[in-house]
Amino acid sequence: MSTTKTSSETMSNYRWIICSMLFFATAVNYLDRQVLSLTWKDFIAPEFHWTDTHYGTITAIFSIIYAIANLFAGRFVDWLGSKKGYLWAIAIWSLGACLHALCGWATEMSLRLKDVNEMIAASGALTSTIAITSVYYFIAARIVLAVGESGNFPAAIKVTAEYFPKKDRAFATSIFNAGSTIGALIAPVSIPPLASYFKSIGVGNGWEMAFIVIGALGFIWMGLWMFLYKKPNVNPRVNAAELEYIEQDNNNPEESAEQQAAANDFDNKKISFLQCFKFPQTWAVFVGKFMTDGVWWFFLFWTPAYISDVYGFASDTGTAQMLIFVLYAITMLSIYGGKLPTIIINKTGKNPYAARMQAMLIFALFPLLALFAQPLGNYSYWYPIMIIGIAG
């Protein structure tokens, strides 16, 4: 009776609402990360007398802390669970984003300067003192941001595993991962104008409110997450048909009860951190991320400054915003890339793991295109923009 009812019932699609929340969180994650790269050259550097070295130091430490925090973020999310783990992660990084806005005030107080105008007008040895002091404060805020942001992808992947069967997880992952592209896409057309607007009305130097406004988006997400998220088996918005679809990997008619029990035991088995390194999959992901993430983050952090220095377009000009927008618009192709493993499965009958590996091999060739960005940039600024977009 129950089987007939489930099969004839129209399936709800609440899993896609959850996926949209993951998308939103990832977009906010990248928005918060981009505020500094889009404001430092034209808004922050004149105030604190920064050079490329100062900014590079901040981004390097952020990247190191983010990498270290990632080692523990997954365990933290497993310990707290998807709901609380995600809430804590986004609360920490949103707080970190907002803390950036206090760095100017903290620098003034530390050096006993009257106001921002005295800081901008400083000369001689004082400029170096201002730069170094402010860098320390920005590093502190950046560390908080990095620790919080490290929890986004482990939490999102855990939720995806809870709400999607194995055959759909790559596509769902590509959708929420596209939030990083959307966040980066929205950033150049929202953050510099925000900073310019608040500067024009006399609210600080403008960049402070950009950090606060963008950081506040995370707190809005937290309210929605508390209301919307429950595990699918206890969520009243997930009907029986959808729950059966989500749990189809646990109800494979081609497997015996013993095989299913063994598979469930393996999936639920907890292993130590060091034991993870015994699996070749761990090393494959580690090496893959090591080889690609550094390149992507380099483009993420430095492209706005590259456009400003090489082509003379400040971050708040229409041309600069258009160039960054087009770059990240091209990376939106990643959504369709997530569908490739499903296409391979349907056409070849390969298992999900083999299909994902084949798709990853194809995508691994794309970053090589970035080698042509700099030499072709001598002919037109459009070449590096398009090439970096495709490589990303």
Task: Place the predicted regions along the sequence by residue.
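Extracellular/periplasmic helix-loop-helix junction of adjacent transmembrane segments
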Residues: S37-I68, L113-Y136
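Helix-loop-helix hairpin linking two adjacent transmembrane segments in secondary transporters
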Residues: F176, S180-P236
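Primarily marks hydrophobic transmembrane alpha-helices of the MFS/SLC 12-helix fold
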Residues: Y86, F138, M357-M360
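Extracytoplasmic
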Residues: I17-D52, T107, F299-P304
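Extracytoplasmic gate region of multi-pass secondary transporters
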Residues: L36-K41, L274-I335
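Cytoplasmic helix-loop-helix junction between adjacent transmembrane helices
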Residues: Y137, A141-S180
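Residue-level signature of mid-helix packing/kink "hotspots" within the transmembrane helices
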Residues: Q34, S63-L71, S150, A184-L185, ...
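C-terminal ends and interior cores of transmembrane alpha-helices
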Residues: A91-A131, L361-N378
